[in-house]
């Protein structure tokens, strides 16, 4: 696995692979990798001949009071994980390499509606930052396919819409969330949890599963169901950002008529914000 830091070196390496007729996959990350990221790279290696991973902690997608400065940087460990997972090329640009003209006047990519509400409501500007950096990486690498985790369900929906609306010839693949044995979705931010918070954290996914079971049993009063689950989570020590049942494609609030729905949650344990979701096909 080669590691490059400049756009020039990235494009040269990708051009060599493409000249050899290789199918190219991209897996963008912010580093501090766990086995969920490794699963994305492994899947990319199964679907393509040349896997490019990126590690870039993107300032544009962090709010003023978020964890940009403290987000863990673990490059050596990340390189080892990527190598074992089947990555061929790692791109680790600096902020100056990604935004050579500064960020104040950077052209931004905005995906309306899908970026609003849910995480977009509590993290204004976040998805604009995500869409902008992902579109830049897509232009830099020009992959045949790109793989993202379904844990960030709203992010995946935003990227799918961006690719569709901007006619990018890239196949977007969502991979199922990788979980710890107790059900907690793997996240780079789980390391912020204290021991007590880590023990409590699986209750978020348990509440989502219970919500899905009740919906599958025929419950149609979503508001009452969500209210009871919010109370349950608050009693377990969570501070709720949102708990919603949405149409799985449009992310608009689900009704009794929606067959494909997604249950989405974001909640704080202490200062750590956890997100999770579950896609459900109603009979």
Swiss-Prot record:
Main localization category: cytoplasm
Enzyme class at the top of the EC tree: ligase
One of the protein's GO biological processes: pantothenate biosynthetic process
Binding site for (R)-pantoate: 61, 155
Any further remark recorded for this protein: The reaction proceeds by a bi uni uni bi ping pong mechanism.
Function, in words: Catalyzes the condensation of pantoate with beta-alanine in an ATP-dependent reaction via a pantoyl-adenylate intermediate.
UniProt name for this protein: Pantothenate synthetase
Organism annotation: Pseudomonas syringae pv. syringae (strain B728a)
Source species taxonomy: Bacteria, Pseudomonadati, Pseudomonadota, Gammaproteobacteria, Pseudomonadales
Encoding gene per record: panC
